[in-house]
């Protein structure tokens, strides 16, 4: 796996799924391929994106700044600086300075990532802030190691919280989760459908599922009533894909 592929993988792992994630993936690919060289426009676009947390925007802004060639005097962006200040906690800043000194001695991406993984997310963000604000310089490889370590920590905590939700025994949360998943699956079916005869069938199934979820939410139903709803939908989606000769395992 190339360095940039690895960076893209880690950064995208902390972006919530949805159309915006696809857009960000495209922007990252363009930047890494040298196709997008207007850093100013890129940062303006990033600043106005909804849904993303300030820290995620800060990390993306840091990656764009590292990758896109720009004039030396280009102004640093406030939204990135604010996100990478370690919540203003002096402890984070102290640890960030210690980490920075260690990173200065590293020359490889993996070496930097290993060193960084033993620090808290706040300290890692502060260290990125130091580099972003030109208070310190490290090689691009080392900076990317720092980025990936930060993303790994964030993704780990997101995964833990996701696992807690999936394994919860609270029937109301499980019920709502099934309905949300059914809705997003229906949306995916509608987006994939296109305009063939089978597509009309897929649209019909998706539409019925959405109406059902809407009705369940409106009138309130027993928490077990949604069991199997997403599975039925996925079964329909896979049958439709088979007929269309499409194999999309990623919906599982």
Swiss-Prot record:
One of its GO terms (molecular function) is RNA binding. Homodimer and homomultimer. Interacts with NEP. Binds ribonucleocapsid by both interacting with genomic RNA and NP protein. May interact with HA and NA. Cannot bind NP without genomic RNA. Gene3D superfamilies: 1.10.10.180, 1.20.91.10. It is a peripheral membrane protein. Coiled coil: none annotated. Keywords: Host nucleus, Membrane, RNA-binding, Viral matrix protein, Virion. It comes from Influenza A virus (strain A/Turkey/Ireland/1378/1983 H5N8). This is Matrix protein 1. Belongs to the influenza viruses Matrix protein M1 family. One of its GO terms (cellular component) is membrane. It is found in: Virion membrane; Host nucleus. Its main location: virion. The keyword Kinase does not apply. Pfam families: Flu_M1 (PF00598), Flu_M1_C (PF08289). A motif (Nuclear localization signal) lies at residues 101-105. The gene is M. InterPro entries: Flu_matrix_M1, Flu_matrix_M1_C, Flu_matrix_M1_N, Flu_matrix_M1_N_sub1, Flu_matrix_M1_N_sub2, INFV_M1. GO terms for biological process: viral budding from plasma membrane. Residues 165-252 are annotated as: RNP-binding. It comes from the Viruses. Most abundant protein in virion. When expressed alone can form virus-like particles in transfected cells. Residues 1-164 are annotated as: Membrane-binding. Plays critical roles in virus replication, from virus entry and uncoating to assembly and budding of the virus particle. M1 binding to ribonucleocapsids (RNPs) in nucleus seems to inhibit viral transcription. Interaction of viral NEP with M1-RNP is thought to promote nuclear export of the complex, which is targeted to the virion assembly site at the apical plasma membrane in polarized epithelial cells. Interactions with NA and HA may bring M1, a non-raft-associated protein, into lipid rafts. Forms a continuous shell on the inner side of the lipid bilayer in virion, where it binds the RNP. Determines the virion's shape: spherical or filamentous. Clinical isolates of influenza are characterized by the presence of significant proportion of filamentous virions, whereas after multiple passage on eggs or cell culture, virions have only spherical morphology. Filamentous virions are thought to be important to infect neighboring cells, and spherical virions more suited to spread through aerosol between hosts organisms.
